[in-house]
Amino acid sequence: MKTLFLAIALFSAVALAEEKSESAELVPGGEAFVVESVNYPEDASANLKQTWKLTTTAGNFIHLECTDIRLFEDKPCGDWALTFDDGGNVTEMCTTSFDHKFTSKTNTLTLTLRTGRDARGFVACKATATKK
């Protein structure tokens, strides 16, 4: 009976996972793209995987300014993390920051926010394209 209950609980947790995805093509000198987690400024949903795929023209970069990152601090990062992938260079953070800046090394940047079984943590940033 315990095994059946555990199997149902695990299946329910997996079945309830939420995935969101957005993409944007940024132009140097153009408008900023707002990156906000689901429910911001409230906590993001539990079991969330939210992805933002940002691109700009070849030879340019993507600059990110985050004014509100609140994730569980853990080493190594656990279930709550924000990942920056700029074409193979992957950085992961799980902390609180009100002034985090990141500039990609390529013309693409993929951000992924993931949350654990509790609805906790959120992210708010602005992305712009910058010339070399």
Curated annotation (Swiss-Prot):
This protein's UniProt keywords: Disulfide bond, Secreted, Signal
Domain (CUB): residue spans on this chain: 22-129
Tissue: Expressed by the venom gland (posterior main gland) (at protein level).
Endpoints of the signal sequence: 1-17
Disulfide bond residue pairs: 66-125, 77-94
Top-level taxon of the source organism: Eukaryota
Xref: InterPro entries: CUB_dom, Sperma_CUB_dom_sf
Cellular component GO terms held in the UniProt record: extracellular region
Major localisation: secreted
Localization terms from the record: Secreted
Family statement: Belongs to the venom CUB family.
Name under which the protein is recorded: Venom CUB domain-containing protein 2
Organism: Platymeris rhadamanthus
